[in-house]
């Protein structure tokens, strides 16, 4: 079946595999990479959740709502069984003086290569998650990821200590001055990079109103094509829907612009498996509430007619 969203994503994967540069990287995993690429998704044609592997809409939506709420603590995510950010918080904990368990140095690589260590790692992670959920003081200290996306979107702080809600301001601008070229939200705050568990990969987005439709363009400096990008596509498509509804507009395009678009060397088999699959028709999104974007919960969102191939597991590079 024809699915323009799968087709665009598959095309990017194939191009990276064909012409990409082999590079070392921060995680020492190794990548094949292309610098500079753009995908365009017409959101009137459906919701761009890939169908050639199962992508969890719940994980996409709860992470985005976490950003929108300005939250930076994984406790909110874990309440929805969303484990996307666990490794970065866990890393901070096991490097602290409060951790007294087995040595977790380089747990990302060791858990993939040593089955015995992997069992220890899973047990320590399980205990960590339980403490985050059940011990608010512990969660406050070790569940916080620093000044990551939610903080920058909702509470940007300048050098004078003034605070600025970028997302709320942009929504107000769209309502009052839709033709402005300043509908921009940035997560890249150079003065706070060192205080973030992970510097923002999706760094800046801009809205553009045209004929009653809201378009959104994202610039992503670093893009994990197999694990991250399917989530990023769906996340910013959902953001476009939510902001459009808030502003009384229809959705238009989501434009995804990449800097370093890369496939990790240990994702090659997974990518080839996905590329061998045929697509299903794209699903539809329904927002079952008139709440403000800042009050919406996951339960207010509904994904209709999502049919996909099974998920494909691959290791995360920390």
Curated annotation (Swiss-Prot):
Subcellular location: Cytoplasm
Reaction(s) the record says it catalyses: dUMP + (6R)-5,10-methylene-5,6,7,8-tetrahydrofolate = 7,8-dihydrofolate + dTMP
Residue numbers binding (6R)-5,10-methylene-5,6,7,8-tetrahydrofolate: 224, 317
CDD domains: TS_Pyrimidine_HMase (cd00351)
Pfam families xref list: Thymidylat_synt
Binding site for dUMP: 26, 181-182, 221-224, 232, 262-264
A GO biological process held by the record: dTMP biosynthetic process
Top EC group: transferase
Cellular component aspect of the GO annotation: cytosol
Alphabetized GO MF terms: thymidylate synthase activity
Pathway entry: Pyrimidine metabolism; dTTP biosynthesis
Alphabetized UniProt keyword annotations: Cytoplasm, Methyltransferase, Nucleotide biosynthesis, Plasmid, Transferase
Active-site residues, as the UniProt record annotates them: 201 (nucleophile)
Principal subcellular localisation of the protein: cytoplasm
Enzyme Commission (EC) number: 2.1.1.45
Disulfide bonds: none
PROSITE patterns reported for this sequence: THYMIDYLATE_SYNTHASE (PS00091)
Family affiliation: Belongs to the thymidylate synthase family. Bacterial-type ThyA subfamily.
HAMAP family recorded: Thymidy_synth_bact
Name the record gives this protein: Thymidylate synthase
Organism from which the protein derives: Staphylococcus aureus
Gene: thyA
């Amino acid at each position: 079946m024809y699915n323009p969203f799968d087709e665009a994503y598959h095309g990017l994967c194939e191009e990276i595999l064909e012409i990409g540069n082999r590079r070392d990287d921060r995680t020492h995993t190794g990548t094949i990479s292309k610098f500079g690429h753009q995908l365009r998704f017409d959101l009137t044609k459906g919701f761009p959740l890939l169908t050639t592997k199962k992508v969890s809409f719940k994980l996409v939506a709860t992470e985005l709502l976490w950003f929108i709420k300005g939250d930076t603590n994984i406790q909110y995510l874990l309440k929805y069984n969303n484990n996307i950010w666990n490794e970065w918080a866990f890393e901070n904990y096991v490097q602290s003086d409060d951790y007294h368990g087995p040595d977790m140095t380089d747990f990302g690589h060791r858990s993939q290569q040593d089955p015995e260590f992997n069992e220890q790692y899973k047990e320590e992670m399980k205990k960590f998650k339980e403490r985050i959920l059940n011990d608010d003081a512990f969660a406050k200290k070790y569940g916080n990821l620093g000044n990551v996306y939610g903080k920058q979107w909702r509470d940007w702080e300048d050098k004078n200590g003034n605070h600025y809600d970028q997302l709320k301001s942009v929504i107000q601008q769209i309502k009052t001055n839709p033709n402005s070229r300043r509908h921009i939200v940035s997560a890249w705050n150079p003065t706070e990079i060192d205080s973030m568990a992970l510097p923002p990969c999706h760094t800046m987005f801009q809205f553009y109103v045209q004929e009653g439709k809201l378009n959104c363009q994202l610039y992503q400096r670093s893009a994990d094509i197999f694990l991250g990008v399917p989530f990023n596509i769906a996340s910013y498509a959902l953001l476009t829907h939510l902001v459009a509804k808030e502003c009384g507009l229809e959705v238009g395009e989501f434009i995804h612009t990449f800097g370093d678009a890369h496939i990790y060397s240990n994702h090659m088999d997974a990518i080839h498996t996905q590329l061998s699959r045929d697509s299903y028709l794209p699903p539809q999104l329904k927002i079952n509430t008139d709440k403000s974007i800042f009050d919406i919960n996951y339960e207010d969102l509904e994904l209709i007619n999502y049919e996909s191939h099974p998920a494909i597991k691959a290791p995360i590079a920390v």
